[in-house]
Amino acid sequence: MKRALISVSDKNGIVPFAEKLVELGVEIISTGGTKAAFEQAGVPVTGIEAVTEFPEMLDGRVKTLHPAIHGGLLARRDTAEHMEAIAAHDIKPIDLVIVNLYPFQETIQKPGVTLEEAIENIDIGGPSMLRSAAKNYAAVTVVVDTADYDTVLTELQEHGATTFETRQRLAAKVFRHTAAYDALIAEYLTDVTGETFPEKVTLTYNRKQVLRYGENPHQDAAFYTEPRAIENSISAAKQLHGKELSYNNIRDADAALKIASEFKEPVAVAVKHMNPCGVGVGETIEEAYLKAYEADEISIFGGIVALNKEVDAKTAEHMSKIFLEIIIAPSFSEAGFAILAKKKNIRLLTVPFAGNVEGFEKTSVNGGLLIQANDALVEDTTSYEVVTEKQPTNSEMKALLAQWKIVKHVKSNAIVVGSDKQTLGIGAGQMNRIGSALIALEQAGEKAKGAVLASDAFFPMDDTVEAAAKAGITAIIQPGGSIKDKESIAMADKYGISMVLTHVRHFKH
């Protein structure tokens, strides 16, 4: 290895790396700020202008886009015609490229960033050099990640060259890196133009964690997160205590966070298998948790609980009495954390709560991807319609609105029975609506008397209303829209139940 081209925006570790290369007899070629850093550190360096015999121009936009650089990178060492061609133009081969790119991701995440600032942080020369070097990995070593410095140096020191396997691995990493870089730029500019569903979608995610296994032990899995952080999400969670999250933990925690984000008042949400098993609302977070626990004392065991307020000592004492997989909250008081951290198997996570996340959700199908807007519609309650003779009381309306926030997060067909303070029965995932209703009503038992019922979609028949009436339900909220709405309304009138139509459906598959 005789020549290395180094041009980096992240200069961590680059000076000692270059010093080791010089000790190995490698000539260093560099540009701009990287060259200045080497000169300041006393590292011998050749400026890019000396190689290209052409000055940097356009405020640095053009400096390495030159045949003297790319010829030296792309020439196949095993092809005589290539080597003769570059020799004829006095171009020398470049054996090692160390490049990392302008910080586009970091730039667009800055508050108040302008489009001009974003565009100026789109790297052109860097990806070009990386791709040229990676294409010719048979002869050229290319490094885009500072984590690979030690591997490359060790091989050079021990063997005088890198192995083919290492060069191939690093080349693959480069193409992943440049593809992700371009995907993020495309996503950002697409957002700027306002296009919702462009003709091509290129997604990029960063691996956060290799998981022990997936949904089941025989399934391999990993957790990837979006480059642009979403604050109120499991991907932004900070783990304070406990062992690593599992695949199922992450999915359940995501579901719990979405429900908890629906409420401004203190709320506690218990989730099992991505469905809520108990939701409680209170004046304090302690009261909210107790309501969630009372909602289903059996199912909450081994579940995930999300709370939208700080977990204090009193709440922690209650929670420590049962086995919970995960507790998620904006924060834990010092005393609350100390109480819960005594349990080594519990996972404690903090997430900043900022309301429901707008944007898009993605669902994979074999051979494709479905993309839709998140179900984060801010509904105009003034457009809700009371269609029965009986009007809901103020307390009933409060309960209806609370359960309406919850039912949208239950797997369809979804029925939730509850009050303004808690869920009392949840029927999820049944193939017919009356089946879910009967489960929810049975779970609520005697507590159904005087409670309300929420349905994520319309009633195809009046049987759900009749079952609700016989259980003691006094008010119902549902989207409406069935050709048999009149029959359901008539059944509600027959039993003196109030019914509110929202005209908004919330299927969840």
Curated annotation (Swiss-Prot):
Organism, as annotated: Listeria innocua serovar 6a (strain ATCC BAA-680 / CLIP 11262)
Domain of life from the UniProt record: Bacteria
PANTHER family: BIFUNCTIONAL PURINE BIOSYNTHESIS PROTEIN ATIC, BIFUNCTIONAL PURINE BIOSYNTHESIS PROTEIN PURH
Coiled-coil segments: none
The family this protein is said to belong to: Belongs to the PurH family.
Pathway entry: Purine metabolism; IMP biosynthesis via de novo pathway; 5-formamido-1-(5-phospho-D-ribosyl)imidazole-4-carboxamide from 5-amino-1-(5-phospho-D-ribosyl)imidazole-4-carboxamide (10-formyl THF route): step 1/1; Purine metabolism; IMP biosynthesis via de novo pathway; IMP from 5-formamido-1-(5-phospho-D-ribosyl)imidazole-4-carboxamide: step 1/1
Any Pfam family: AICARFT_IMPCHas
GO molecular function, one term: phosphoribosylaminoimidazolecarboxamide formyltransferase activity
Protein EC: 2.1.2.3, 3.5.4.10
Protein name as it appears in the record: Bifunctional purine biosynthesis protein PurH
SUPFAM superfamilies: Cytidine deaminase-like, Methylglyoxal synthase-like
Domain notes: The IMP cyclohydrolase activity resides in the N-terminal region.
Record PROSITE patterns: MGS
GO annotations of cellular component type: cytosol
NCBIfam families linked to this entry: PRK00881.1, purH
Catalytically driven reaction(s): (6R)-10-formyltetrahydrofolate + 5-amino-1-(5-phospho-beta-D-ribosyl)imidazole-4-carboxamide = 5-formamido-1-(5-phospho-D-ribosyl)imidazole-4-carboxamide + (6S)-5,6,7,8-tetrahydrofolate; IMP + H2O = 5-formamido-1-(5-phospho-D-ribosyl)imidazole-4-carboxamide
Lineage, highest ranks first: Bacteria, Bacillati, Bacillota, Bacilli, Bacillales
HAMAP family documented for this protein: PurH
A GO BP annotation: 'de novo' IMP biosynthetic process
Keywords: Hydrolase, Multifunctional enzyme, Purine biosynthesis, Transferase
Name of the encoding gene: purH
Start and end residues of each MGS-like domain: 1-144
